Amino acid sequence: QHRYYPYGATLTHILGYVSKINDQDKARLIADQRLNEYVGTSNIGKLGIERFYESTLHGMPGYEEVEVDSRGRIVRQLDQYPPQVGQDIYLSIDLKLQQYIEKLLNGRRAAVVALDPNNGEVLALVSSPSYDPNLFVGGISGTDYNALLTNPNKPLFNRAMQGTYPPASTVKPFIAAAALTEGVITRNTVIHDVGWWQLPNTDKRYRDWKRWGHGRVDVIRSIESSVDTFYYQIAYDMGIDRLSKWMTEFGFGDRTGIDISQSEESRAIMPNREWKFQRYEQSWLQGDTIPVGIGQGYWTATPLQMANALTILINNGKSYTPHILLNTKSSVIGPEVPEISVPMESTLLNTVDAKSWQAAKEGMYKVLYGSLGTARHVFAKTPYQAAGKSGTAQVYGLKADEVY
């Protein structure tokens, strides 16, 4: 059968595609001792769900063993192995939500990830712009492939899982929860922000986004108004060792474990002393720590990592592995085939007390509805309640020194 993707570019960065088996695929099948399963088969899953669940979707070819005479005529049947049809798989993706997000983005370079915090199901994963996977099924032409490769908007690049960007101020609620737990700050800690913070014993100053400052600021206000100086001080007091350790607990610096090939998901960077020395053969400096407090410096994250970290905060430390598969079922009537369901794996970041989680959430609520919230105008008239965190950072593109 010829694989056809009816929704075109809408689901490409989730589903991936199938295409002709090449030498690299054959080498992998030989290594896995599965080449015999592809007798008479020309296509194989190359990316996304098609690749990750290839063995589930593919099935097994059938054949029979017969005895023949000297003229090649069949004398008798020795054995028969009927073909096994691949299983149907059911995904967690909300197609209408996926299409709605894609419509809002309208081809702009962006990524959106929507997770269900109750179980880790991926409801939408959009990387814009995308491309039509049907181009690859029968073998893509050189002209079409070159057009995709040279497109300045990089449609082949999965921004949601491979794009690494400074998480910027979106991480302030996580840092606040960690600092409260560590005793670096309390709910009553107040600073007076004059628009900058100075590294002790130096003349180095780090600016706040609000040049004239925010005045008196506590932890709730620091999230509501995204006060940079509050987090410069936290970063200085915590140090990179504790800061990096805590953010690793939220999943930064590692793959999420989503059911798509590891080669399609970036670890991004949660910097620490060891990382900098391995990367640059340089020691970690105190000045390197300060921008990490506002999600910048060497720190990068994928949109999927950021969504995953948020679900951990929402659940007071409970973590579910993001997953796209709901279950599988036999696609034919006949002998029962075992169904596969994704286990709801969860862990508990139980070192954070309930009051610290609540402070982070209260600050995020005020981002949207507080009188000084950075996103108050966007959510002022919504018929529902929500919480969130804004973040702005300079982002470097795929080409060296290209800013967009």
Spans of model-derived segments:
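Short hydrophobic alpha-helical segments used for membrane anchoring or interfacial signaling
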Residues: 112-117
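Beta-lactam-recognizing serine transpeptidase/beta-lactamase-like catalytic domain environment
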Residues: 68-78, 118-169, 174-404
